[in-house]
Regions:
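Ligand-binding clefts/hinges and TM-proximal coupling segments of bilobed small-molecule sensing domains
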Residues: 30-34, 40-41, 163-182, 214-223, ...
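Periplasmic-binding protein-like
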Residues: 51, 131-142, 206-249, 266-267
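Extracytoplasmic small-molecule ligand-binding "clamshell" domains
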Residues: 32-33, 40-110
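Acidic, polar ligand-binding/catalytic clefts
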Residues: 75, 87-150, 216-223
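Short, low-complexity disordered leader/linker segments with a strong preference
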Residues: 1-42
């Protein structure tokens, strides 16, 4: 009888040890400070993207689905981390909202025509560059504007918190002209302002402008300030940044990145 009691006690002790070990493991998992481990536990990647930039991130009005090169790139990152390209949730952002949403932790990363600058590197960590562009200018085709200097004293529509204004200011200084600026939250708003005559020109990166080019408009030939696009993550999140960079490196090596760019008319 005593032998059975000892066996019972030992058995219960083993169960307790296993249970306790499991609880500690679960607790350790719950309190993990590794951002990538927390991300994997969450089971999906939350990404800030544009929904008003044809070819990069644009909401298809027929399907309601967000499409574009940066959408495909984000799915590739999700596949690298989770083994499933659909383990991703997209949140629309603008140039003004993308940084704050990343800071608060609502987003894991931002893939939204985000130009990498030395100033921005102080606030966020950026991936290796995946696309290079330059600032361009769109005007009405029936306007008298043929060159950048023709815009002296005129009003340019730009996006809030974008690098465009600073790039144009430098260009205007070099050209010896003065520009006025009107800032808008979204690109469609700037295009409407141009069409209605409230502004004289619409300026942003060339690839973005090209998505808004219609028969009634034209692009000036001048380009300003090279724009290097990178994926942004919260400052110090090196684990996620490494995963993003590994994804980009793999896509470049395999030729898939070029294929993606060609698919969306960016190459």
């Amino acid at each position: 009888m005593r032998k059975h009691s000892i066996k019972t006690i030992v058995g219960l002790a083993l169960i307790l040890v296993c249970t306790t070990t499991g609880l500690f493991a679960a607790g350790a998992k719950e309190t993990s400070t590794d951002p990538l481990a927390q991300l994997k536990a969450k089971g999906k990647l939350t990404v800030g993207c544009k929904v008003d930039v044809p070819s990069f991130g644009y909401k298809n009005i027929n399907t309601g689905v967000i499409e574009g090169f940066e959408i495909d790139l984000s799915k590739a990152v999700a596949k690298h981390i989770f083994g499933d390209e659909n383990a991703v949730e997209f949140t629309p952002v603008t140039a003004k909202t993308r940084g704050p949403l990343l800071d608060t932790g609502e987003l894991d990363m931002v893939a939204a025509t985000f130009t990498v600058t030395e100033e921005r590197k102080n606030s966020w960590d950026f991936s290796t560059i995946y696309y290079v562009d330059a600032v361009a200018i769109m005007v009405k085709k029936d306007s008298s504007f043929a060159t950048f200097k023709d815009l002296d004293g005129k009003t340019i529509g730009v996006a809030q918190s974008a690098t465009t204004k600073k790039s144009l200011e430098a260009g205007a200084k070099d050209a010896g002209i003065t520009l006025k600026y009107s800032e808008y939250a979204t690109y469609p708003e700037i295009k409407v302002a141009l069409d209605s005559g409230r502004i004289d020109a619409f300026s942003v990166d060339f690839a973005i402008l090209n998505g808004y080019l219609e028969d009634s408009c034209k692009l000036l030939s001048e380009r300003f300030a090279k724009q290097d696009y990178g994926i942004a993550v919260k400052k110090g999140n090196t684990a996620l940044l490494d995963a993003v960079n590994s994804t980009i490196a793999d896509l470049k090596k395999s030729g898939e990145l070029d294929a993606m760019l060609s698919k969306w008319g960016l190459k």
